[in-house]
Amino acid sequence: MGKYLDPRADLTFKKIFGEHKHLVISLLNALLPLKDDECVESIEYWPAEKVPDRPLAEKDSIVDVCCKDNKNREFIVEMQMTWTDSFKKRVLLNASKAYVAQSKKGDDYELLQPVYALNFVNENFMNDVDEYYHYYHLVHDKYTDKVIDGLHLIFVELKKFKPQTFSERKMQVLWLRFLTEINENTREVPAELLENAEVSEALEIVERAAFDDAEMRAYDKFWDNVSVLKTLENARKREIEAAEKAKAEAEEAKAKAEEAEAKLKQEKFETARKLKVMSVMTTEQIAEATGLTAEVIEGL
């Protein structure tokens, strides 16, 4: 095992961003769509009982850090190791719960503060677009400057991220490089990461030497569970694909059979018409020859 552990794991991610307030503040300011006067200045972590419950099947694939700032804005930061079709809806549900939980009976609705859900996803889920950063919020369909400030959902597809030089988004690039480039195989850390005080501190936190044996067992178990969940999810997807393929093939076979039946029926009609015009056979004989009823033949 190398010098560093993967920062995306439950143990490491929470140790970095769940125990060091200034680092999660830096991450939020770098990744959230905040204006200059909206930057996060201080935060308090949510108490354990407030953190959303996870479905049993997803408990080992989701890492989260939850907090609120001095303006009472709520922040849910998640690292999603495997993608499921229900993930976006679950993110929306948990953000909505956090928003509703602010309201107390008799309170002024103006006191409600926005909720930001920042989600790092380790699998691509929008394969038809190149961008890695996806921001959803409540905006007027026609007048896009008209916004209802309440729920802000951000999804970052880590596999799509390519390190480039963005001077206006320097910290965003540095944090994403940290999350995508640092792992157990890292032998040499890029100078840009070491030169930044906050990222350099995060690097020290994920050094292998900083973890005891019990923590390493938990770390290894996390990745084992992720592998199992990925295997199960891939198997589920294959089953769905196989079922959809079988359904499509059955529908195609049915359509071909119906087409062949309609063609055969039309041929019988044409044969019956010709025989009727020739007047060489009785209606009963034509019916016997074509399989059509006498009533149908009479109507031709």
Task: Label every PLM stretch briefly.
Residues 14, 29, 96, 177-180, ...:
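Generic alpha-helical structural context detector
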Residues 26-27, 90, 174-177, 201:
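Long, highly charged amphipathic alpha-helices
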Residues 94, 132-138, 169-176, 222-223:
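Short intrinsically disordered coil segments
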Residues 75-80, 173, 180-300:
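Short, charged alpha-helical interaction segments and adjacent helix-coil junctions
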Residues 1-152, 162-164:
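Accessory alpha/beta interaction modules
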Residues 150-173, 181:
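Extended serine/threonine-enriched, polar tracts that run as long, contiguous segments within proteins
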Residues 20, 24, 167, 235, ...:
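Hydrophobic (often cysteine-bearing) scaffold residues that line and stabilize catalytic clefts
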